[in-house]
């Protein structure tokens, strides 16, 4: 018999982008996946990777590869053209599989790529915890908020551009919105 607690795991936005957007850049905790309760093993920095390399192959497919504390993230094609996401710290992940695909399959070899680059931008993602083999997730790593205000700037982007300039623009926009 297993006891299980149910609580809100995330407040998520999911986008399907062109499958040609395979190059990833971000300012966040990395270079490996990082969650609110596990990010101390990562370092805040600017990282470059690929959608394929963000995938973490667990014994059973599940949500994976998220980057905690992301300030900006870019997805570009081989020519450097793409999209930039900028915001107050958010969790970010780009992958080849939908959440449903990861949830429904029991083994990685059963996974079918979606044909798009699936992007998750989460206001908050609860910690991973160790509930399957240890204590349940600590209260401080759970999403308890009921009223959420989450703004994210999406803008065309090229690798030649400075993502920090776009982040500064986004920060100015949010400061003005907070005055209203």
Model-based region annotation:
Residues 1-180:
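Beta-strand/loop-rich accessory regions of lumenal/periplasmic or secreted enzymes
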């Amino acid at each position: 018999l297993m006891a299980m607690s149910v609580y809100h795991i995330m407040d998520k936005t999911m986008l399907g982008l062109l499958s040609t957007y395979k190059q990833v850049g971000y300012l966040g905790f990395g270079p490996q996946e990082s969650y609110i309760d596990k990010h101390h093993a990562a370092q805040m920095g600017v990282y470059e990777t690929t959608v394929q390399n963000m995938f973490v192959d667990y014994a059973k497919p599940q949500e994976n590869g998220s980057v905690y504390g992301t300030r900006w993230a870019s997805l570009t094609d081989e020519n450097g053209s793409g999209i930039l996401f900028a915001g107050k710290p958010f969790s970010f992940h780009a992958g080849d599989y939908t959440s449903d695909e990861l949830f429904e399959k029991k083994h990685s070899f059963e996974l079918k790529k979606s044909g798009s680059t699936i992007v998750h931008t989460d206001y908050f993602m609860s910690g991973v915890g160790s509930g399957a083999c240890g204590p349940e997730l600590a209260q401080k790593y759970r999403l308890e908020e009921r009223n959420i205000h989450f703004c994210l700037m999406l803008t065309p982007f090229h690798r030649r551009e400075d993502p920090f300039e776009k982040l500064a623009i986004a920060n100015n926009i949010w400061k003005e919105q907070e005055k209203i």
